[in-house]
Amino acid sequence: MLEKGEKMKVFISWSGEPSRKAAVVLQEWLPSVIQAVDPFVSSESIRTGSRWFTEMGTKLKDTNFGILCLTPSNLEAPWILFEAGALSKQLEESLLTSVLFGGLSKGDLECPLSQFQNILPHKEDIRKLISTINEHLADEKQLSDAQLTTYFDKWWPELEEKIKDITVAVESETKSKGVKLKRDPEEVMEEILELSRNTVRQLD
């Protein structure tokens, strides 16, 4: 729980242009729903500057909540892995969330990315993310369930439209780079079961 009057510092990690757009969109949108958050997105200037390690280290140290914007193209990106590793060392698992764009599933992730709570950029998953952030605010900063629902329902349509654009950009990037996803084990098992059922029907 945060100290009285303290805003929650949310570190949003990205790598690649579609992921950066997603991070910036979340940075701008989150305070519309929960005013007691202070989202941070690292800029290209920080990443390429001579003092990047010191500056990033300070931001990561002060972070209360971490969000990764993951796409099929950035799962092995050095920046994502560095920031994910630093966040996972500092924060408990419930305070770490990955937003999976471009058809990603948990089966596509390896450590440290697999340590995060994984959500899709869908309405109910984003609602759960907002609810989790709200639960970890200082008591006097927390919104009631009714307030949270009101603010979320008001601002969700704006985010939804931007997510559609991001999804198109992610799919275009994935296609241009020839990235292929792992198949979800559950999906493979379902396919095997369906094939087995069809075989049994043919034998009957």
Please give the residue ranges for each predicted region.
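Short, well-structured alpha-helical interface segments that form or flank functional binding sites
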Residues: 21, 51, 79-82, 187
